[in-house]
From Swiss-Prot:
Catalysed reactions, semicolon-separated: an N-(ADP-alpha-D-ribosyl)-thymidine in DNA + H2O = a thymidine in DNA + ADP-D-ribose
Keywords in alphabetical order: Hydrolase, Toxin-antitoxin system
Claim: Hydrolase is one of the keywords in the record: yes
Region of interest (Interaction with DarT), residue spans: 165-354
Subunit text: Interacts (via C-terminus) with cognate toxin DarT; this heterodimeric complex neutralizes the toxic effect of DarT by preventing ssDNA binding to DarT and consequently inactivating the toxin by direct protein-protein interactions.
Stated name of the protein: DNA ADP-ribosyl glycohydrolase
Record family assignment: Belongs to the DarG ADP-ribosyl glycohydrolase family.
Pfam families: Macro (PF01661)
UniProt binding sites for ADP-D-ribose: 13-15, 20-22, 31-34, 79, 117-121
Organism of derivation: Escherichia coli O127:H6 (strain E2348/69 / EPEC)
GO molecular function: hydrolase activity
Gene Ontology biological process terms in this record: peptidyl-glutamate ADP-deribosylation
The protein's enzyme class: hydrolase
Highest taxon of the lineage: Bacteria
Amino acid sequence: MITYTQGNLLDAPVEALVNTVNTVGVMGKGIALMFKERFPENMKVYALACKQKQVITGKMFITETGELMGPRWIVNFPTKQHWRADSRMEWIEDGLQDLRRFLIEENVQSIAIPPLGAGNGGLNWPDVRAQIESALGDLQDVDILIYQPTEKYQNVAKSTGVKKLTPARAAIAELVRRYWVLGMECSLLEIQKLAWLLQRAIEQHQQDDILKLRFEAHYYGPYAPNLNHLLNALDGTYLKAEKRIPDSQPLDVIWFNDQKKEHVNAYLNNEAREWLPALEQVSQLIDGFESPFGLELLATVDWLLSRGECQPTLDSVKEGLHQWPAGERWASRKLRLFDNNNLQFAINRVMEFHC
């Protein structure tokens, strides 16, 4: 029997929990990230199986939790092949038939299922719901809880992250702390730009690249997808948010946990003191640019001068904006957003620090 509900699927009082996964072994955001943290052994087995090409669309990859309380089974349901790609309805249809087989063969009494392929997967929820009802609706001996699309399961703040600091973790956490000290809220967008400017400062000081971030010219300026891994480690212990940081939108606010101020400061002044000059340079560089607009402007101009082969002139930078690699829509947005005075101010500041 199917029942529809909303909320946190991991709290469901059922024998089996369905976790939507890809076939490459990444649980980086949304409910999959929560599964990764709640059931680490499942993550280890699943990741190994992905390396061995054992996780495929249309087939459930099932592990047992071994817990006395809570669910017995974790049903890893592949809704994607690559984590960056969208789901396909045929993968949902085939997977539901394999899920049905599992429920019958194992005599499962209750199961909780998320909105398969909807949300991050890009599928239309009413279409997915119809497929679930068609495949499982006649299983009267199984209590099937269907969690409809909602942000509630994502908006559960992470209670704790890693405690061990590294130079990269300490530097990013300190950048966020300093930003708040200035009286400015710090968004995820701004952290991306701060990280870019820090990496550039480290380059200029000819120090070891502790961040190892792979930046690309994105919608709002330089963007590094792998920064999310670093932020996820800090999330819950050194940084806080109303939702999990990997699920946050560009303008969602991230703040520093002030209870960790002394610990971070001690680490930076001992193990990571080599990178303090780069941190100081970023603090001076962003003076007067402390806002989503200002940091996008500054980081975009810095990208064009350092990676886009532009000259430090207004005409050259504007031509670089016309050719912004993220696409015509985002190039036009930047040209509308940044006037000549803004651009010249940013050019002067970048040249002051990076000439």
